[in-house]
Amino acid sequence: MLQESIKKLVQYGINTGLTPECERIYTTNLLLDVMKEDEYTDPDCDLSDIVLEDVLKDLLDAAVEKGLIEDSVVYRDLFDTRLMNCLMPRPATVQAKFAEEYKKSPQAATDYFFKLSQDSDYIRRYRVKKDKKWTVDTKYGTLDITINLSKPEKDPKAIAAAKNAKQSAYPKCLLCIENEGYAGRANHPARENHRIIPLTMNGSRWGFQYSPYVYYNEHCIVFNGQHTPMKIERATFVKLFDFVKTFPHYFLPSQPAYFSMGPMWPPMWASMMELPLDQVERKVTFMRPEQGTPAPVRGPTPKMTCAFSS
């Protein structure tokens, strides 16, 4: 059963393009090492309908039985991320492929990267599909409601382990560039299957990645290559325009300078979601305080968006 699951996971990597056929044996050996298996007989099994969630569950159950991990969602997530990294191309390969696709079009590049982020299980499709989304018509416009259910609930043992775990300042936060390839620990998620696309915005180094929780359509994160506080200044808007020139099919707002994310410096969030400002239907008048005169602006019948995280 264990060897069948290993073979299926390797085949999944080949089917999705994460792993080239020429690396079948190499990838199999990586997985055997992670699972602490010394023997392999290339089992005869059905490879026609491979469900990633099921294959990973079988491997995780085997890891628990062998005493490799504790049976909790935190340690299972750490371990299956390590398994998926065995299938993954190196960051340089991903960046080169992204650049190749970008020559076709910006959207071709992001389509490739978004698919890779899902195929790698960095974005766990089987959890994201649990999210609830619906719309409600109100007198103020259409209200979009989303309830995020894709973040797993931690069990009490995992919470205690995270509390008692040795504190580390590396990576500095959950969104620093140093997370790429990081194995994780009880109080920090694994990012071995995580890949980042480097960007240059206003002459400075930034990183581009997708959110593992997909709050909105192709929800991505753009973060500073340096762990520095967010500032709202002229350079901020130059960076925003640099991004949307590079990826014109995305929008990119900036977090306010006072916005706090605990130990994380606030990043910028991007998406392909249609926002209320895209729904222009009626005229709205705003006042310019410094002039004391009305400034007519074509605005929308509000389409509101609310997001709740459980």
Each model region followed by its residue ranges:
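Active-site microenvironments that recognize anionic phosphate/pyrophosphate groups
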Residues: M1-R234, V280-M304, F308
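A long, hydrophobic alpha-helical segment
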Residues: P248-Y258
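Histidine-centered divalent-metal-coordination microenvironment in nucleic-acid enzymes
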Residues: E218-H219, N224, P256-D278
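Long, well-ordered alpha-helical scaffolding segments within enzyme catalytic domains
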Residues: I232-H249
